[in-house]
UniProtKB/Swiss-Prot annotation:
Family the UniProt entry places it in: Belongs to the pseudomonas-type ThrB family.
Pathway(s): Amino-acid biosynthesis; L-threonine biosynthesis; L-threonine from L-aspartate: step 4/5
Keyword line: Amino-acid biosynthesis, ATP-binding, Kinase, Nucleotide-binding, Threonine biosynthesis, Transferase
UniProt-recorded name of the protein: Homoserine kinase
Originating gene: thrB
Annotated InterPro entries: Aminoglycoside_PTrfase, Homoserine_kinase_II, Kinase-like_dom_sf, Pseudomonas-type_ThrB
Keyword Transit peptide in record: no
Residue intervals passing through the bilayer: none
Enzyme nomenclature, EC number: 2.7.1.39
The organism of origin for this protein: Methylorubrum populi (strain ATCC BAA-705 / NCIMB 13946 / BJ001) (Methylobacterium populi)
Length: 321
């Protein structure tokens, strides 16, 4: 989450006239993240999140995201529910951007999750995959393996200014990943961005999953690999095998992983690290001037890739099934 588009008090109050949310009491921009402009809203009826969708999010994809959140919430998953306006729609326009309001979830995100938090996250992710199985809409993952080389082309000329040798390492990894990427794994709706700041806890229990704006249709195990990268490494590249093993076990306890998925964990984890290294690299080199935004360090994922190059099989990720 971030703020790229400033919203005036006058514009927001006019927008809220389209909703039955009572009187606006306060609002505040959310600086975390890098994708959309987000604001906490406090009205006389409660707390909400307002999102203005920025250029990376295609307006054509918004019905998928909005309908998915509604579907998952109805299936019992703790996630934001879109708020419909007086016309019965969940999408509007504010300051020239598509905009939506969703419900606020209680809980806190964890900057240093332990192994039991990772186990709970694995179970919650499996629950998300189960809840989305009968969702009728499909959205291709436009940040999967076929997109990585074009992404790299946007940053290749400057990559070695970020870290010496980064361009050559990336080219070599892409050659391997493009040749080894698995096909025909079990799949359906995935979150595709389930980092620690997109999961809320109350105590040791998951209380909510948020930020579904990369959700798409892809392999379930790839979603798990994204979270392995996000939850089980330190910023310096240190891998915590106990956390990864707990996450895999927590997932498998809810939805049994198939042998092909288990065998694919090393290449999926390597690919997931590549995806986030590349998008971070492009963002790092292209931060809009004046934006209230904190660009993410691409080298955190370059360091994760160094680990993935050494992994032989799922046991290196703590799998004990």
């Amino acid at each position: 989450m971030a703020v790229y588009t400033d919203v005036s008090d006058e514009a927001l109050r006019a927008f809220l006239q389209e909703y039955e949310l009572g009187e606006l009491l306060s609002y505040k921009g959310i600086a975390e993240g890098v994708e959309n402009s987000n604001f906490y809203l406090h009205t006389s009826t409660g707390h909400y999140i307002l999102t203005l969708y920025e250029k990376r999010v295609s307006e054509a994809d918004l019905p998928f995201f909005i309908n998915l959140m509604g579907h998952l919430a109805r299936a019992g998953l703790a996630c934001p529910q879109p708020v419909r306006n007086r016309a019965g729609t969940a999408l509007g326009r504010l300051c020239g951007r598509p905009a939506a309001i969703v419900t606020f979830l209680e809980g806190v995100s964890l900057s240093r999750p332990n192994a039991e938090h990772c186990r709970a996250l694995g179970a919650a992710l499996a629950g998300l995959h189960a809840a989305g199985r009968d969702f009728p809409m499909v959205r291709e993952n436009n940040l999967s393996v076929g997109a990585w080389r074009p992404l790299f082309a946007q940053a290749e000329a400057q990559a070695d200014t970020v870290a010496p040798g980064l361009a050559a390492r990336t080219r070599a990894d892409l050659d391997i990943l493009e040749g080894a990427w698995p096909k025909d794994l079990p799949g359906g709706v995935i979150h595709a961005d389930l980092f620690t700041d997109n999961v809320f806890f109350i105590g040791d229990a998951v209380s909510g999953l948020i930020d579904f704006y990369f959700a798409c249709t892809d392999a379930f195990a790839y979603d798990l690999a994204i979270s392995l990268n996000a939850w089980c490494f330190d910023a310096d590249g240190t891998f915590h095998r106990d956390k990864a093993g707990a996450m895999l076990a927590g997932y498998d306890a809810v939805r049994t992983l198939e042998p092909a998925e288990i065998a694919a964990i090393p290449v999926l984890a390597r690919g997931a690290a590549m995806r986030f290294m590349l998008t971070r690299l492009v963002d790092w080199l292209n931060v809009p001037p004046g934006a209230l935004v904190q660009p993410k360090d691409p080298l955190e994922y370059d360091r994760r890739l160094a680990f993935h190059r050494t992994a032989a099989d799922a046991r290196d990720y703590g799998w004990e099934g």
